[in-house]
Amino acid sequence: MREALKQAEIAFSKNEVPVGAVIVDRENQKIISKSYNNTEEKNNALYHAEIIAINEACRIISSKNLSDYDIYVTLEPCAMCAAAIAHSRLKRLFYGASDSKHGAVESNLRYFNSKACFHRPEIYSGIFAEDSALLMKGFFKKIRD
């Protein structure tokens, strides 16, 4: 999760919503991909940290099946990212801060509990939640000032 926080800090420095994601091989605990939100620079709403990390991981291992991998994200995934996590079959999801507005894991939609979801990862929340929340608060304060 520390590396995901570093990625979120990079996003913050680039005036992107500070979310970072890291995908880790469960067998050897090595990071295979890492990313941060990049929607502003790419001018594309799909460039969330999770989507970029999943795309890169699939490219690296030449497979759409990430069942031997875990994802660490600084913020509770939105519906789009939760669906991508399910479709790529990531084994475990670790996330930091809850997202009361757009979170789709435990805060609002609860995508993984829906009938539309065919794969439910193990979910662990609250990992470095305070650090993640402080980054988010700092970012939105910065853009309001």
Curated annotation (Swiss-Prot):
The active site is at 50 (proton donor). One of its GO terms (biological process) is tRNA wobble adenosine to inosine editing. InterPro entries: APOBEC/CMP_deaminase_Zn-bd, CMP_dCMP_dom, Cytidine_deaminase-like, tRNA_aden_deaminase. Binds 1 zinc ion per subunit. GO terms for molecular function: tRNA-specific adenosine-34 deaminase activity; zinc ion binding. Zn(2+) binds at residues 48, 78, 81. Its cofactor is Zn(2+). Signal peptide: none annotated. Residues 1-116 form the CMP/dCMP-type deaminase domain. Disulfide bonds: none annotated. Its EC number is 3.5.4.33. It is an enzyme of class 3 (hydrolase). It catalyses: adenosine(34) in tRNA + H2O + H(+) = inosine(34) in tRNA + NH4(+). Gene3D superfamilies: Cytidine Deaminase, domain 2. Keywords: Hydrolase, Metal-binding, tRNA processing, Zinc. Catalyzes the deamination of adenosine to inosine at the wobble position 34 of tRNA(Arg2). Belongs to the cytidine and deoxycytidylate deaminase family. Homodimer. This is tRNA-specific adenosine deaminase.
